[in-house]
């Protein structure tokens, strides 16, 4: 298989934000080295902190993709070709290297940047070792420094970790070699390239520490930081002490935080599991009373125990199994970092308890694996399978690597037992996909029983440089052969059964595999560790066996995270950490001005007349707030008691965008929030006739408009008014203190140069980019552009600018919509396919569906109505107006079925690509024993052009199904829907 990288909207938005905030090239520079071919062009505002850029992206959302594409984009737009990527550790360096050098990444980027390649130069420990008595520079450093801009198709990238960058090898200047520019110092040589620096994981590079200072030493013109977290700075003391994130421009230029990532389905949901202890075991706990480099003091009630380096914790309590010792330097031998006040529970160290976690992890793995493998499980036309991987974090390498190691023996015993039960179950299954799964299980059994099993593998820090070929093969599979791990079969058709991985913390950073669905922690990580980072290896959305990335609305996925009882508050801490990342912190005591503005801004999109006065009046009338806008403690509305803040969030769920939605992270021991909603089958059966039609596949047949493409090419590519020469800007910069004297701001004034224009693109490149963006054949583009260049443009290649390109693309999209918006019809094909809720092969509806494809907000107070499409409560909806209003309404008896449709329930094809589904369905019984089906698409009054297109598309499609008594309506308010339903009921 090959992983297929796709352009995701949030990644495109990130790239756009970076380029919008980039200061551009300084075409007015008087520097004598401005045209130095071994260095980047001079950047406006270079070496100035305010020109630097911060990009905040949550773990698992693709920051490596973004900064890799950014390098291609800056090379294409600005001619910048020398980048230094600085990472905090060798593990992250390996991860970045694997992505940039992967075939799938190169193939993906080649479609946008033809004939351009990244020359990745990686500096590793040992590269500076002298050979034959001579101290030479590493070849990778030479390649980077001596790369010339005259090689216009190559981007030179130096990838280095922090320790290496600040090492003596980089600072020394006594090498037996002189680089271009006359220097013998690696640091000075990099300085001469005038690099753009990309920092990965900026929280590991606080600006007052050595790691960051080593970056400043190479004198980057601009620094761009990418990370989920950023370093903090503290000012003041005592009650005046303030700690805040240290951003270059006081806030990130792109901010995709944890809340948005989870709420918008950009990462997996999380389920937290842990086996319970007996009451006696749970109460038996020891507190770290003090911990020093050579001494640990544990306390239980009034009794204390002093342990020195090398002392075994079993001397304190036999429950501490596994030869756990105090290793010194505030760490146990299992690498658990200790701090005063920590609690240690011996029961969680017992082998029987560890075995429980392993058993639960295996059970959870196969529960998820069966769902991912079978998926639709039809007789034919099955969707691609998804490989399921599990990751175990363990204490001891010997317990896994040794043939008789306890962990390995226990895991294999439990796995064999589980496989035997599953094989016995699937021997009686008959569907094709079920038979395939039986083959997969039997292949797993065979491999596990062989001398060289290929079912599980481990990677540990101690494995680096191991001479054991079998271990090295395991390590290579885990670190480098991502596509092999994600594949079900090799090129010879043999099953790839490896899917259980073991590590200490070596795989905690830098490594990722999107198909990790289970993480089991057989070791505690300590209280200071980032909880998001711990689950981070399993957050990425998975890919199927074709390499396609699976979005949450297509196939909802969750990470099963198994921990010990001693971390049972993990879910609460994780939710707290996610919510602390909110752009706006919700005040549960008082309605703040920021909260008011958030509600008003979002409501205005639906109702332009909504104001802050209207909001406050509504809350005041309900008694939710007092005259100081403080929330009242307990309010009774409709017989339900809640705090003022709780009522505010229910009435105005727009605020939920600033906190993690319920069900995204679940502690399975405490909560049973429904992540799936059961269908009321009896109601869906009443509308089955419709879905028998909706499951038919349709193709779009465009009208053959004579010479359309030639006409568009002539009207757009041949339109001289769309061509502009780009004028360089002269930027005058001056530094000024801010009004509060706490910061320095850069004030800029741009002036156009008179009669000076920037050079344009190469002719072939300009033609190719139009072709990629519009689909107009190259032959047509060339014919019209060549003619225009000879006539109106007088052969002036400066007109082949980015401005001209953007004008052409914008005009093409406008003309395409004008010509083809109604110039097509739907043609029914002779086959059917599943929708999100209906299986035509079985002629039946699914039992349940992912709750969030119905709606992201929850109404626990919804009244039971046996005509509704789903079991209640809770009721799911997306917007208060009109969605929640429509769902809460008491309809007349003629309405026999109603409800909100899940996404992809119908899948009306769009001429712009993709599909769309209306929001609501109503079934109305008439007096003459006939029925009418009302499909409703709800939109805001001030709808966007794209929303209007969707309405037009749906109307056109449903008009072809009029014979099935379908009425399609668009509505901007609940009253419109009530009125139409009332009218249809009376006819």
UniProtKB/Swiss-Prot annotation:
InterPro entries: Helicase/UvrB_N, Helicase_Restrict-Modif_Enz, P-loop_NTPase, RE_endonuc_C, VRR_NUC. Residues 886-974 form the VRR-NUC domain. This is Type III restriction-modification enzyme BceSI Res subunit. It comes from Bacillus cereus (strain ATCC 10987 / NRS 248). Its cofactor is Mg(2+); S-adenosyl-L-methionine. SMART domains: VRR_NUC (SM00990). Its EC number is 3.1.21.5. It catalyses: Endonucleolytic cleavage of DNA to give specific double-stranded fragments with terminal 5'-phosphates.
